[in-house]
From Swiss-Prot:
InterPro entries: NADH_UbQ_OxRdtase_su1/FPO (IPR001694), NADH_UbQ_OxRdtase_su1_CS (IPR018086). It holds the Pfam family NADHdh. It comes from Elephas maximus. One of its GO terms (biological process) is mitochondrial respiratory chain complex I assembly. One of its GO terms (molecular function) is NADH dehydrogenase (ubiquinone) activity. The lineage of its organism: Eukaryota, Metazoa, Chordata, Craniata, Vertebrata. The chain crosses the membrane at residues 2-22, 69-89, 102-122, 146-166, 171-191, 222-242, 253-273, 294-314. The gene is MT-ND1. HAMAP family: NDH1_NuoH. Its main location: mitochondrion. GO terms for cellular component: mitochondrial inner membrane. Its EC number is 7.1.1.2. It is found in: Mitochondrion inner membrane. Belongs to the complex I subunit 1 family. It is a multi-pass membrane protein. This is NADH-ubiquinone oxidoreductase chain 1.
């Protein structure tokens, strides 16, 4: 029974990832005044399936001087972690109801660094290694701001459990009182998932393709799927934390539709950002976090702690 539950969570993610690639290409096409994919199938709808067949039927090529074991394990680890993170997300009910589900998600997303680092090191290519080192520094840096923002959210929520956020936001979404944190969180999720304008790990003009430059066929597709699964997961988490997914036990379907629609809107915002902004310089990327986001998030965290303490000091009004 547990296996069926696992499959019902993980299997819908794969077609969602496939069609997100199509939506991205279509959206970027229309934003750049062109059509995008429109040949394979009606309106280009079968393009992701054609891409998947092409990639998984090709033979993977291993560089002669690469570390074959790590080279193969890295993309498998990336996709496994990307799918595992979905387990505690309430949609409206989680696969595994953990007490520390928020901490679990942060820990799992931190482990993604290893797959990128291994792929860059195992490729034995200077471009791949440079991209991997950039990715590691970037991901670790923005994890700091995300963890501090999460701490503020937990103070408002009173629990690390994601299901409790639905109860907290029954009357007011946390995006309204905590909009500065929401803005910093959204920017941090862009950096965490290595998306434009923070896509320095795969800077085509400098590093050819970044950490996955030596990958082809199936392993490359696994990295691609992991990246897009992480994008959808981060947006789903943003919806749970800031935009309230009220769960009605009588009609859980309404809650699921509500949750999915909000996640789709945020995901389209991710694509919109890619179409609108140029890539950051690497020093600007680090400056933004360590000199701007970190002091602000720490100050807001202290502010939220002081609010709770000051409210607790007020005597009850008759």
């Amino acid at each position: 029974m547990f296996l069926i539950n696992v499959l019902t969570v993980t299997l819908p993610i794969l077609p969602a990832v496939a069609f997100l690639t199509l939506v991205e290409r279509k959206a970027l096409g229309y934003m750049q005044l062109r059509k995008g994919p429109n040949v394979v199938g009606p309106y280009g709808l079968l393009q992701p399936i054609a891409d998947a067949i092409k990639l998984f039927t090709k033979e993977p090529i291993y560089p002669q001087t690469s570390s074959k074991f790590l080279f193969t394990v890295a993309p498998i680890l990336a996709l496994t972690l990307a799918l595992t993170v979905w387990a505690p997300l309430p949609m409206p009910y989680p696969l595994i109801n953990l007490n520390l589900s928020l901490l679990f998600i942060l820990a799992m997303s931190s482990l993604m660094v290893y797959s990128i680092l291994w792929s860059g090191w195992a490729s034995n290519s200077k471009y791949a290694l440079m991209g991997a080192l950039r990715a590691v520094a970037q991901t670790i840096s923005y994890e700091v701001s995300m963890t501090t923002i999460t701490l503020s959210m937990v103070l408002m929520n009173g629990s690390f459990t994601l299901t409790a956020f639905a109860t907290t936001q029954e009357h007011l979404w946390l995006i309204f009182p905590m909009w500065p944190l929401m803005m910093m969180w959204f920017t941090s999720t862009l950096a965490e998932t290595n998306r434009a304008p923070f896509d320095l790990t795969e800077g085509e003009s400098e590093l050819v393709s970044g950490f996955n430059v030596e990958y082809s066929a199936g392993p490359f597709a696994l990295f691609f799927m992991a990246e897009y699964a992480n994008i959808i997961m981060m947006n789903a988490l943003t919806v749970i934390l800031f935009m309230g997914t009220s769960c009605d036990p009588q009609m859980p379907e309404i809650s699921t539709i509500n949750f999915v629609m909000k996640t789709i809107i945020l995901t389209i915002c991710f694509l919109w950002v890619r179409a609108s902004y140029p890539r950051f310089r690497y020093d600007q990327l680090m400056y933004l976090l360590w000199k701007n986001f970190l002091p602000l998030t720490l100050a807001l965290c202290m502010w939220h702690i002081s609010i709770l303490i000051s409210l607790a000091c007020i005597p009850p009004q008759a």
